[in-house]
Amino acid sequence: LGLTTLSIIDDCIKLIIKENKNFLINKIPLNDTKTYDQLSKGDTVGIFQLESNGMGSVLRQLQPDRFEEIIAVVALFRPGPMDNIPSFCNRKHGREEIKYLHSMLEDVLKETYGIIVYQEQVMQIAQVLSNYSLGEADLLRRAMGKKIQKEMDMQKSRFIEGAVQNNIQKKEASKIFDLVDKFAGYGFNKSHAAAYALIAYQTAYLKANFPHEFLTATLNYSIDRTEKIILLKQEIERLNINFLKPDINFSDPLFSIETNDTFK
């Protein structure tokens, strides 16, 4: 997957190690307070996957303080699951009761406050409630994605049969299956969400802790995009960093750090 963001991170690291030779991006803490404070303010200009105004609004509502919540936001911020964002935020902050489809599913859904977010959770629900094997659970996930009625009817019968063996009433099992099916239509693969969330967190960490280096690298990869340059210039000024105009006698071909509080 070719992403400009990966090149920005790489160039940012090259700038950082000029002063901090021991810096390793893979060793940064995933519980950095400055990073979460920045995200909770919706300060996401230049941050991978989190830069839109809509995402900034979600982060201000959520006030994330752990990496798992960044993964969930990446998965939820899409048509369909987006409807669950208000409940996700409210449940985190105790403004809404956390409810589970069944008490047996607390371990499966606790991380996401009782809301089905990932395809993997659909598979785990089938395993816990209806004794599906991992292979069977994957077939269920695929069937729910395809919405082929014949397959769905077979899966529903299998799901209810397994649930009854775990002392769950047929009517309740049928209701749970229908609810899971509804969510499964837009469930996101957690491993994909985690990969994107990690890049998002890394860019947020770099901006929070090494703003000069990060913004310099970001500017240089936006050099042919006037609107992006203007946005980044506004962000730099908001952070009280000076932004010098080009000088034919002194400027480099690309943006660079002049001093600790000045770009050129």
What residues fall within each predicted segment?
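Noncatalytic, beta-rich nucleic-acid-contacting surfaces in large DNA/RNA-processing enzymes
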Residues: L1-K264
